[in-house]
């Protein structure tokens, strides 16, 4: 399978999809994998200048693809961002200005309980055009009684967390569930891609990591057991230096965060390798 990495502007893509849905051209339609990591800062990767974290697979992706360094974010919060990615709309258009929580908290903030499933989405437009569509990983676009599942928004294949009728539940039975979650998500993504390798397909791969609470496995932590991070490293800007300088235990906290990022990178590397083999 030809593996071409490109980060593109979804608003432009949505404008193009109106034509795509009406005039499908099988030979020219690319397969798309949209990887969304959770709470990974713009410089939390080696290629972006981080002095300690190891991300060889993301480094390779950035070197071979397109790295966009100037951007605008309508909302940096979880659910509004996801709404924007799916719809290409400002989240405020859907009254989604904060993360979805309990219905009581949603009402106090004058928010709906979920994204209206009647809203056209990237997935629903691609599905109309003949794409096989999948959502794998974190959802966080509505939960609780009556909340639609990702299938209602145009996804054929769904393996999700943080939503109604979740495929995986982070219920505390496995203290390392979050630490191992990217591996589970990548397994399902590879399975879906292999079953639809003749395309076209669209996949959301939305990870839980490196969002807190983080609890890497002992094996994941080994990579950083001898690290001695410095809060005043010249690679960090003034705000980051101040933030790290206030850490209660900089070494321990850095080990946990960096180990989580590196495992994320390792699992994505498995996905990239699988794509190269197809």
Report the location of each language-model feature:
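Catalytic metal-binding/acid-base residues of hydrolase active sites
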Residues: 40-41, 90-91, 139-140, 208
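Hydrophobic anchor at the start of a short beta-strand
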Residues: 132-133, 201
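Active-site segment of extracytoplasmic enzymes that catalyze sulfate/phosphate-ester chemistry
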Residues: 21, 34-35, 42-131, 145, ...
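Bacterial N-terminal signal peptides
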Residues: 6-16
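A short, compositionally biased domain-edge/stem linker segment
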Residues: 14-24
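Generic enzyme active-site microenvironment
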Residues: 36, 136
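Positively charged n-region of N-terminal signal peptides that target proteins for export
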Residues: 1-5
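Active-site-proximal cap/lid insertion segments
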Residues: 24-30, 37-53, 73-76, 99, ...
